[in-house]
Amino acid sequence: MSWAGSKRRQELPEDWELNYRLPVLSAAGWLCEVDGPGCVRAATDVDHKKPGNDHSRSNLQAICRVCHGKKSAAEGVARRRELKARRKRPEQRHPGRR
């Protein structure tokens, strides 16, 4: 994930590295738990399975940089689609149609 211009890191707990990131990576044997296409297997990142600030162990997974980039990109595309759909007016039925 690119941290450039992101405020995401500021939202993480101060003890993120020691009490969240390292235990998650260690428990996974430093291997990617996503194992998607192009996976490099060596986990270097910890990802939130569901976006947000839920830092519970059940919502965290070890992930390689390739899988993390693809997952983050897909989440970004989905979010932009959602926001675009909200901007459209709801389709109105023609008053003469039942």
Curated annotation (Swiss-Prot):
Pfam families: HNH. InterPro entries: HNH, HNH_nuc. Residues 75-98 are annotated as: Disordered. One of its GO terms (molecular function) is zinc ion binding. It comes from the Viruses. Residues 41-73 form the HNH domain. Residues 81-98 have a biased composition (Basic residues). This is Gene 4 protein. It comes from Mycobacterium phage D29 (Mycobacteriophage D29). The gene is 4.
